[in-house]
Amino acid sequence: WDGKSLTKEGAGTLILSGDNDYSGGTTINEGTLVAASTTALGTGLVDNNATLVLDADGEVSAVGGITTHSGATTQLALGTSLDLGDSALIQQDGSTLNVELNSDSVQPLITGGSATLGGDLVVSDASLQARASDAEFQSFKLMDMDSDISGDFTSLTMNLTDQPDYLTVTGTINPEDASEYLLTEGLSWNATATSATPAHGTFTLGAGDSFEVTSVLGDKTGNSDWDGKSLTKLGAGKLTLSGANTYSGDTNVQEGTLWLSGDGTIGEMGSQQAVNVASGATFGGSNGTTVNGKVTNEGTLVFGDSEETGAIFTLNGDLINMGTMTSGSSSSTPGNTLYVDGSYTGNGGSLYLNTVLGDDDSATDKLVITGDASGTTDLYINGIGDGAQTTNGIEVVDVGGVSTSDAFVLKNEVNASLYTYRLYWNESDNDWYLASKAQSDDDDSGGDDTPSDGGDDGGNVTPPDDGGDVTPPDHGGDVAPQYRADIGAYMGNQWMARNLQMQTLYDREGSQYRNADGSVWARFKAGKAESEAVSGNIDMDSNYSQFQLGGDILAWGNGQQSVTVGVMASYINADTDSTGNRGADGSQFTSSGNVDGYNLGVYATWFADAQTHSGAYVDSWYQYGFYNNSVESGDAGSESYDSTANAVSLETGYRYDIALSNGNTVSLTPQAQVVWQNYSADSVKDNYGTRIDGQDGDSWTTRLGLRVDGKLYKGSRTVIQPFAEANWLHTSDDVSVSFDDATVKQDLPANRAELKVGLQADIDKQWSVRAQVAGQTGSNDFGDLNGSLNLRYNW
C-alpha cells in the first residue's frame, strides 16, 4: 500500500462521511462506495468498476476526475451535484450514469474540465411540470464543462412520475455550446434515439387537462409501433393544434377533444388523409383553420367558438356525418360557417345551428357544401329574435352541387314571436332555407283541410311599436307567414274565461214565480265553441263546462213590485285545441290550452209585477273571476299563468202576455242587455324566450233579443213552459294577445246571432226544472253550441 490511495473490495457497502484529503485515488472494484460528505473522495482519480453513490446533499468534490467502466454505475442522489475541477468525467460504453432530479435541482448538475460520454443515462425520481403548450418547454443543464463534450450516451431512460405520454425528454449536447449537455422537454412525436421514450403519435389527456401544440407536426421516421405520420387523441381532455401541420397520416379522435386554432391545419393541400371522429369524441376548429382530407364524424364536429363571430372552419374533402355537427357560436351572435369543399353525406347525423329568426337577411350559422348533399341529416335550430315574415327564407345550407330532397329534415319546432319557421328545399338552386310562410293555394295537395284565410290578409295583425317585424315586407308577391299554433291556446283561455261569465236573467232564473221568501238554484252548462284567429290562420276548438250555484238573500215587495238580491258562485273548466295554419312544406302544428277557476258574484232583480213577471223588469249582476291557465305546445313545453276577470251587466225587458182561447198563455219579451268586462293575465316567457302578454283589456257586449214562451196549464197550475229566444249580440273589442309586442286577435265576429230553445217544468209549487239548448253563429266560421240544466227551489 502506498499510504495515499483507497481500494473498495467485496460486495458490501462502504460509506465515507469524513473530510478526506488523501491524494492517491479511489478504486472501486466490488460492491458500493457511498460518498456521504462533499470531500469524501479526496483529491485523486476515482476509478469505478462497481457502484459509486454520491449522496452528500451538496456539491461533491472529485477534482481528480471520475471514470466509470463498462458494467459500472455512478449515481448522483437527489440534492447532490458534482464538481470535477479541471478533471474529466469519463463514462465508458456499457456504463451507467444515474441522476436523481426534481424542480429544485441545481443547474448545471455536473461541472468539470471535460467529459467523454457513452453507455446509458438514467434520470430517476423526476417529474415533468405540467405545461400549457409546447411553447413553454424547458431544458435542464445537466453538464457544463470547460471544453467540448465528446461522445454521447447510447440511451436515455426516464423513471418519471405522472408523465403524459405525449411528452418526452431528450438528452443532447447543446448545438450552440458543445461544452453543455442538456435534458430538453419535447413532444414524443419528435423523439429521437436519445429520448426517454420512443417516438409515437398518441396524445392522451385526462379529464380537465388541456395542451396546445404550437409547433408543426410533420412526417417522421416510423418504428415498429408507429407509422411516423398518424395522430391519435385519447383521454377526456383537450388537445389543441395551432400550427400548419403537414403530417400525411390519418387523425383518429377516439376520446376527448381535438381542436384547431390559430394557423391550425391538418395535412397539406390536396392531401388524401382521413380524420375520424369516434362516438363520444369532439373535433373542431376556430376561424381560418383547415382540414385537408376526408372527415368521418361519429362524434361531435364543432365549427367556430363562442368568442368568434363569423368564423369559417374549412374541410377540403368529403364529409360523412353520423354524429353531431354544431356551431360553437354564441346563440346571441350567430354567423359561423362550416365550409365543405367536397360532397356531404348524412348517415343519420344531426346539425345544430344558431339563427336570428327574422326576415331573409337574418344572421345565421351555415353549412356550405361545394359538392353534392345526400343521405339524411336532422337539423335543429336554436333561434333568437322577434320573428318576421320571410319570402325565400334564411339560407342555412348552401349546396353547390345537387341535393336530394330529404338531405336535411328540421326536427324541432321553431317559433319566434308570432311565427313558425320551417325548413324548405329550393329545387332550383338546391339550397335549404328556414322560412316562415304558409301554404298557398298552389301548394295545397288537398290531403288535409287548410284553415280559411278569414278574409282580410293580415288585418288582425298589429305591428309592434318598434316598427315592424310583423308587417310583411313588400316583395311583390303574396307570401303569408306560418303562425305558431299556441296563439289560439292563449286566446282560447281568455275567450272561455270571458264567455263563461256571460249570462242573462232567464239563463239564471227561468220563468218561475218567486215568492218573498226567496229561493236557491243550481245550473250546469256544457258546450263546444269553434272560432278562428289571425285572419283565419288559426283554428280554435273549445270544450267547456260550468257549474253554478246561487240563492236569494234579500227579497222585498209591496204587493205588486218586487226586488230580489242574491249571491252566486260558479266553477268553470275549458279546454282549447289550437291548430296553426299549414306551412308551405305541409307542416301543421297544434297546441292546447286549459283554464279553470271560479266566479263569485251578486245579482239584483226588479219586477214591476211580482206575481206574473209581466211588464217591465231590470236585472243587474257583478262577477269577479280568478283562474288558473296552462298552455301546452310541442317543443315550447308547458306554460302556466294566472288571470282574473271582472264583469258588470245591466239588462231590461218588457213582457207581454197573450191569453189564448184554450186558457194557455203566450208571452213576448223584448230584451236589451249591456255587459262590461275587464280581463287581466300574467305575462309569460316561454322556452323560446318569447314574452307573451298584452291580454289585459276591457270589452263591451250588447244584446238585443226577443223571448217567446208559453204556459201550458193543468188546472190552475202551470205544468210546462216551452220557450225560444233569438238574440243579436255585438262585441266592441276582440280577444287579443301579444308575442314580443306583436299583437294578434281572435276573429270573433263583432255581430253574432243566437238562438235558444227549451222547456221549463214546474214539478210542484216549490220545485222547477229547466233544460235549454243554445247556439251562436257568426262570420269567420264562428259557432257555439251548448246545453244547460237548471234546478230551482222556492222557500
Residue ranges and their predicted role:
Residues 1-3, 100-102, 113, 118-228, ...:
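Extracellular/surface-exposed low-complexity segments
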Residues 1-46, 67-68, 186-275, 374-381:
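Extracellular repeat-rich scaffold modules on cell surfaces
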Residues 53-138, 204-207, 282-394:
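Extracellular beta-strand/loop-rich repeat segments of large surface/secreted proteins
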